[in-house]
Each structure stands twice: as structure tokens, then as C-alpha cells.
Amino acid sequence: MAKHSTTMSCLLFFVLLCLGSHLAQAQVLFQGFNWESWKKQGGWYNFLHSHVDDIAATGVTHVWLPPPSHSVAPQGYMPGRLYDLDASKYGTGAELRSLIAAFHSKSIKCVADIVINHRCADYKDSRGIYCIFEGGTPDSRLDWGPDMICSDDTQYSNGRGHRDTGADFGAAPDIDHLNTRVQTELSDWLNWLKSDVGFDGWRLDFAKGYSATVAKTYVDNTDPSFVVAEIWSNMRYDGNGEPSWNQDGDRQELVNWAQAVGGPASAFDFTTKGELQAAVQGELWRMKDGNGKAPGMIGWLPEKAVTFIDNHDTGSTQNSWPFPSDKVMQGYAYILTHPGVPCIFYDHVFDWNLKQEISTLAAVRSRNGIHPGSKLNILAADGDVYVAMIDDKVITKIGTRYDVGNLIPSDFHVVAHGNNYCVWEKSGLRVPAGRRH
């Protein structure tokens, strides 16, 4: 009897250890701002601080905060004095530190929006060109001149820098990331954001603006726990204006970047967003590629893919590439139960009043230990229905078709449902929600 009890105890310990490892891997990112957040009376940091408990209740593990520094544009994407946090339109440096501490008290990690492809200068040089930069400190850190601008950015450069390693950004000087002083001082600034301000990871804005080799330098120099890059490529479209079924070239670019940078580096899965927002318009056959896998980055390298429905660019008031508004919850049913790291948008939780539905789906993810590398088995992908099983524990259906025949085993029961989506969970042993990591 004692031997049997010991064996059972060891088995239970092994099961809990395995489940715990899945929970440790499970990640849900929350974008904690939109394009208009800088206008908030009383400051966005203070406003968000008052909602930390609400955000934690959605089950997120990471929160993505806006660019923290002085910027010519109020949203933060035209940065200048990088060390000057008090000039941010979102609030002061002290308010930012307090907000990060509040999230940390809920075991939520904070991701800074890092804009380093380009930078705005404070002063003109002898040519009358704005290319003299101030770092925001009494000393010379990040106090640069035209030598630190890419030589082929002829509007600003003096021609002495290296050529740009990525795409051009026309609205501000493209920084020469092959310059050793640039690399050293930007790495020091990033490490200061970690050690002094409290950030845990980076969201790399316009990462197409510099090479993956450059990105790897900053990731290796700063050892963040989480990194996600914005690599917004143009999808392929057919003659009728619809996205092509095959988007392998688009997702290959994302995979190549993540593999080249290595470590914790991941990329926003723009391919999945594009395919999914077309698919929910009665074309759910799009959600399975020719090899029976998911059509986005999550079909090839899910561990490094961050899926999303909308963000401050594609949605919000910019609305440049929005998900169909009446089908947003179908999108969340997909990304919150599928491989990859799902990202929840602030607007959908608070402005669209979808907090309860999104939280329910996030709880299903946590309870069943769904993680970036979870196993995906697509059971059906027709025009009006998509059904998939994840880790043999969860089944998700999206689409207008109500009857899915015998695709749902008898030992599965409904745990979440809404407008044209439903999620089932396998009966039996449940993974406890536990402490989020």
C-alpha cells in the first residue's frame, strides 16, 4: 500500500510539474494604449494605474506601454531626448515607474515601445539642418551629430555614416546603427530602462528600418525577457483585391527575422491578422494552408509569433487596416485558443465593452495550459466554419455554421460562446489557473 501511495504521489508530482511548465510558458500580451491615449486628462499613466486590477483580471502576463521618451509627435513615435521621460505626453517618469511597479505587484511584466530606427534632433547644424541631437541628460550621452545618421539619408546626413541596413523612414533622420557609439549608447539607454525604470522587455517599432543583425546586437546587449518586432510587410493580393491564399513569402520574412535575432525575439504575426480578417467574411477555408497547418506565422514558427486583432495603427482612430468590427470576437476566439502569443487591444476590452468575453477566453487558455508551441489540429476549414483542436484539450469553432456534425467528441463541453464562435473543453483533469508568470 505504501509503495502504491509513493508511486501515485510521484506520478501526481510529474503531472503537476508538466502542467506547471506549460503555465510558465503561457503568455498573453495586452496593448495598454491607443492612438489617442496621450490626450487623457490627468495623464495616461495615472489613468492606466487606476485600471491595473481590471487589466490583471483579464489574465494577461505582459503589458505593452507606449514610447516613454520626449517626442516631437505626441504619440511618442518621433523621439528626441530619449532619457527625458518627463516630457512624454503620457505622464512623468515618476508616474511611469509607479505604473510599472503596480503591474509588477500583479506579476505582470512591462514591455516598452522602443523607437530607435529614427530620431528627431533639437538643433540645426551649420547647414541649417536639424541633425544635432540632445540625449536628455546633463552629460553627453546620446548627444549626437550628423555622423550618426545613415549616409544615404541625404536629407539629413553629412555623408560620413554607414548606409542604412533597412527600410527608409522619410519623416526623420535614420540612425546609423553600425556606428559603435550609437550601439553602445542605445544599449546603455535600454539597460537603464530595465534597471532604473523597471521595464522587462521591448516592442521594436518599425523593425524593418534596420537589419536583424542590428536588432540582435541590442537584444544580446540588454537581455530582455520578452521581445516582439513590428515587421509590417505587404501581403500578396489577387486581381480581385482579395488576399492571396498563399502568403508564404510574407510569413517567411517574419520567420527569418525571428530566427536571425534569436533568443527571446518574436514578431507580430501580420500574416495571421490579414488572413483571419478576410476569412471571417465567409472565407474560413483560408485558415488552413496546403499542408493542413495555420496559414500565418503560427503555422511555421508559433513559438515566435505574436498574434493580434488590431493595434493603435490598424485600429483605433487611425483605422488603417481594421478587423471587421462585428467579427472581432471570432478573431479573439481564434488567437486566444491557438498557438503563438496572443495580444489583446485596450480598445476592445474597455471601449468596446468586450472585457468579459475576452477574459473568459483567456481563462480557457490559462486553465488548459495553452502556450506558444501548443499542438494545433485543424478539423474543418470551409467557407462558413472553422474548427480546430488544441493540445487535445480545447476545441474552437468560428463561423456562421451552427451544426458541426460529429467533430465534437462527447467528452467535451462548452466553456465559452458568443456571436458565431464556440469553445469546448475536455472534461476531466483541469489545469489550475495558479500564479501567472
From Swiss-Prot:
Task: Please name the GO terms of the biological process aspect recorded for this protein, alphabetically.
Answer: starch catabolic process; sucrose catabolic process
Q: Which residues bind substrate?
A: 70-72, 77-78, 203-208, 232, 234, 252, 293, 299-301, 312, 318, 397, 402-404, 414-420, 424
Swiss-Prot/TrEMBL keywords:
Calcium, Carbohydrate metabolism, Glycosidase, Hydrolase, Metal-binding, Signal
Its UniProt entry gives the catalysed reaction(s) as:
Endohydrolysis of (1->4)-alpha-D-glucosidic linkages in polysaccharides containing three or more (1->4)-alpha-linked D-glucose units
* EC number per UniProt: 3.2.1.1
UniProt cofactor(s): Ca(2+)
- Cofactor detail note: Binds 3 Ca(2+) ions per subunit.
- Write down the CDD domains for this protein, in alphabetical order: AmyAc_arch_bac_plant_AmyA
Q: What are the annotated disulfide bridges?
A: none
At which positions is Ca(2+) 1 bound?
A: N117, D164, A167, D174, G209
Task: State the source organism's domain of life.
Answer: Eukaryota
Tell me the residue numbers annotated for binding Ca(2+) 3. D153, D168, F169, A172, D174
| Coiled-coil ranges from the UniProt annotation | none
- The signal peptide stretch is 1-26
Q: What else is known?
A: Binds starch not only at the active site, but also via accessory binding sites on the protein surface that are important for efficient binding to starch granules and thereby increase enzyme activity.
Family as reported in the entry's similarity comment: Belongs to the glycosyl hydrolase 13 family.
Outline the subunit composition: Monomer.
Q: What is this protein called?
A: Alpha-amylase isozyme 3C
Tell me the organism. Oryza sativa subsp. japonica
